[in-house]
UniProtKB/Swiss-Prot annotation:
Additional facts recorded: The A53R protein from Western Reserve and Copenhagen strains are predicted to be inactive because of mutations that introduce stop codons or frameshifts when compared to other poxiviruses.
Family under the similarity heading: Belongs to the poxviridae A53R protein family.
Keywords linked to the UniProt accession: Disulfide bond, Late protein, Repeat
The organism's place on the tree of life at top rank: Viruses
Keyword Repeat appears in the UniProt entry: yes
Each TNFR-Cys repeat, start to end: 36-73, 74-103
Alphabetized InterPro entries for the sequence: TNFR/NGFR_Cys_rich_reg
The protein's name: Truncated secreted TNF-receptor-like protein A53
Disulfide cysteine pairs (residue numbers): C37-C50, C51-C64, C54-C72
Length: 103
């Protein structure tokens, strides 16, 4: 296990997502091993395949289908996601502020 100083964990996570989603890692689905998937992925139980979660700032335009992986797209202006997700929606910043989700 690598111990990172304050602030470096975010950098490491950012690099992981860059490599995983933009360079080509994780382009295809694969069968889950012992029912588990790698970091940044989720188990699609319908197909027993490991699929990409979308990184923060993106949402699932198309969910994985067992052959093709999740297709992520940047969130529209004034919306966001803060965690890797598989949702096909984003949170409206104005609504989040009204609901006290942003402090």
């Amino acid at each position: 296990m690598i111990i990172l100083k304050d602030g470096y964990k975010e950098f490491a996570d950012c690099m992981y997502y860059f490599l995983h989603y933009y360079i080509g890692y994780g382009r295809y689905t694969y069968s889950a091993t012992n029912g588990s998937c790698d970091k940044g992925e989720y188990l699609d139980k319908r197909h027993n395949q490991c699929c990409n979660r979308c990184p923060p700032g993106e949402f699932a335009k198309v969910r994985c289908n067992g052959n093709d992986n999740t297709k992520c797209e940047r969130c529209p202006p004034h919306t966001y996601t803060t965690i890797p997700i598989i949702l096909m929606d984003v949170i409206n910043v104005e609504n989040a502020q009204q609901d006290h989700l942003i402090r």
